[in-house]
Amino acid sequence: MTESTTRSACPYCGVGCGVLIDSEGGRITRVRGDPEHPANFGRLCSKGSTLHLTARPEVQAQVRLLQPMHRAQRAGAALPLAWDQALDTLGQRIATTVQQHGANAVGMYVSGQLLTEDYYVFNKFAKGLLGTNQIDTNSRLCMSSAVAGYKATLGADAPPACYEDLAHAATLFITGANPAWAHPIVFRRIEDAKRANPHLRIIVCDPRRTDTAELADLHLALQPGSDVWLYHGMLRCMLEQGWVDQAFIAAHTQGWDVLAAQVQHATPAAVQQHCGIAPAELLQAARWFAGVDAGRTGRSPTLSLYCQGLNQSVHGTDNNTALIHLHLACGQIGKPGAGPFSLTGQPNAMGGREVGALANQLSAHRNLSDPQHRAEVAALWGVPEVPATPGKAAVELFEAAADGQIKLLWIACTNPAHSLPDQALVRRALQRAEFVVVQDAYATGATARYADLLLPATTWGEKEGTVTNSERRISRVRAAVAAPGQAWADWRIVTEVARRVQPLLPTRAHLPSLFPYDGPEAIWNEHRESTRGRDLDITGLSWAQLDAAPQQWPCPQGQAQGRARLYTDGRFATPDGRARFVLPQPGTVAEPTDARYPFALITGRLRDQWHGLSRSGTVESLWAHASEPVAQLAREDMDRLGLAPGDLAYLTSRRGTVLAPVQPVDGLRSGQVFMAMHWGDEVLGGASSTGKRLAGVNALTTAARCPQSLQPELKHAAIKVLKAELPWGVWAQAWLPLAQVHLARQTLEGLMAAFPFASCTLFGRPETGVGLQLRAAAHQAVDTALLERIAQVLGIQGQGALSYQDARRGQWRRARLLDEGAAQLLQGMVLAGDVSAQAWIAPLLQERQNAQPLRRALLQAGTRPPVRLTSRGAAVCACEGVAETAITGLLQRCVGDAAQRLQQLKDGLRCGTQCGSCVPQLQRMVQASLTSA
């Protein structure tokens, strides 16, 4: 068989890295970074470098949606359906819903992980064919505040900077972002810039001391929700010190005097009160941002990087505009190394913004409220008109479904039963909607449980089209292998449904086909034409040019290539060419803490996982860095609450409860709790006292949203934390064949609701095998039939199985050992009742140590093994599988300064030599070794 290499793009974050996909015999065998792609120049993070493992046929057969499925009853089993029958069913249901209830009774919820061409046809289907604006995207949850902020100040939704600016900046102002974990390849470029220019100043604004903050020269640990207070305080300092650029303000902006008066309230004392930032730190941040240094003339450039910490707030738009004001006030825009640079969360959130797939936008950044814009789009699409009334944004869409206004929900490439806030509301909506369609590549998301119709879509490695990254760079996405089963491209599914619906709608039946496309290129050509004369004009590009290399927009007809930076001439995308100073209002979070809910929950990402884990969660090695769901608290709070590491605690907000193990960390203020946004009920489950299934971390978050952007405040909620008294536990681990492990996990997921608390995660490495871990707890012993079922699912039975049961004390244990030469290895273990022995059994099993001398001890309670065991310790480097024990052992022999010791670690163990995501942790370990020496 011949191996081939296909150029494509990574499907994870908005950095937009280029990848080279090696395939052989219809199987993806390896993924490498594309050295010619300007976003990453060959680098990949831990997630991108393991993409080929997500495409393993053994995995795909277990987790993918491979054929259309239909439920005759919502609670029943989904049964296979032919494509024609599925399309006819959906087409008829849509037409009937429109005829009986109007077009606004159909709601479509799409995704920033769709390709631009998929996005375009979804948007045209809703606004052009059905005549409704009831379509929104999960990009509403991450980027709509950035959109609103850019439009309000600069006139267009267009990030003005580029990645190259990282190398030119004298100051980096990173706020509401943790690129070390969320945008790792951007962080590698930040590290490069710091090495090349040791004088580069890095300011990080984040309530937590993250890996990004570890690199900072100044960490501003502001209180959640106080961003505008900080930026106004900085602007006031700049005014007082004469650091603003009055010439730039006079020549290129409007509204300065009113804003200058408004920020006078943000005194250093007020900023300290609201943000917790000392006056000296505030002044330092203002000076560095302004680029004014004592003893030198001119102004050094400042680049700001920001993400969900700004956007996911009830003041999200104000956070964005207040930050952009700092750039405008100092002329820090439109030149190398300067500008407000929004880091996009998803791989094609930018593409969705470009095609107008938001409930209040139209194609090519057109405004729904502008009659001329609506007429332009209607003419392009060949329809009489597009509706003027904005549709319902993401949370509103599900509120309307819960209220019975929306009868049919079509959900594509996203998992709202995990990712939307206030999960109790979301699940009411999914239950009440009369017909729910889930179009997805994966069958494992929580939303799929509510679907009446499931449509199998293609995903990374199988798709053709384009995506746009954070720096406005359009990349080609290419298929390396054929789609598995009966999966279809998203654009094809929409087009086929549209061809069935159009003849059934009286206002559209007489028109020529609105969806005559035969492939993504034809769709892209129509999208390109929609951009003519707009701020994102790409009429100078062709599909062939994109095939040759990624291109930035704008690139209007007549230009040879796109523009790296915007507003270099000081003219902005407003009618008069002047940027706008608006009046953002300083505020606080939607839910301040109080006596009843005294803790501030902060959510965020993990280093090696992505979104709802549908893709990244199938890679066993990506679980090593964070092996199970936890809630992190400050050590003093854990002591005060009587919590030890690993204890279970109830986290309760006004909307719901999550039960999770707790873990102490040093990077949080007292009164704050951090929990990763990845933990949905697919991996973190259990049931309430009434038997209701717990819904993961977003059971806690609030649907309160920014009034301008309608983006919800997913970053913060007021909660209380109470120690859980669940004395009877279950702990199970087992190695399983790759071809079975994901089906086993899905079976265990169905059993988790039998416990008040349960979690189910993967462990292992591709070269050593894959396994499952189940952890659960209850008030009292469960029926032994349930334990037998767990053991059966994990293969802990038959030859080599050892068992112990004490029904009176509620103790139950089972182990299975397999002969491996002269040794015996532990294939699987279930502990029930007293589970303290997991402390030594887990490394025994996961590190494949000889268990033969411990056969009898496996069935005994206790935290200590009868013989001394050594453990690899916690994983540090996911790429090379290097853990703490090896690192600390080598550090004892290392010599020299911190940089030399870090290099010796890299040379000796290869940790930190691949994606680099573990380097901040390695640096902390090096520093600790120097301190203790």
Predicted regions and their residues:
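Rossmann-like nucleotide/phosphate-binding core characteristic of flavoprotein oxidoreductases
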Residues: 722-933
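Long, low-complexity segments enriched in small/aliphatic residues
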Residues: 352-353, 358, 518-617
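Glycine/threonine-rich flexible loop motifs
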Residues: 179-188, 415-425, 465-468
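Long, contiguous, secondary-structure-rich segments that constitute the structural scaffold
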Residues: 484, 490-549, 616-631, 636-798, ...
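A glycine-rich, hydrophobic/aromatic-adjacent loop/helix-cap motif
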Residues: 289-399, 549, 558-561, 570-580
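Flexible glycine/proline-rich, aromatic-decorated loop/lid segments
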Residues: 208-211, 441-478
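Glycine/threonine-rich phosphate-binding loop and adjacent beta-strand/alpha-helix elements that clamp
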Residues: 163, 461-483, 496-498, 702-703
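N-terminal export/assembly segments and adjacent metallocofactor-ligating motifs
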Residues: 1-241, 251, 270, 278, ...
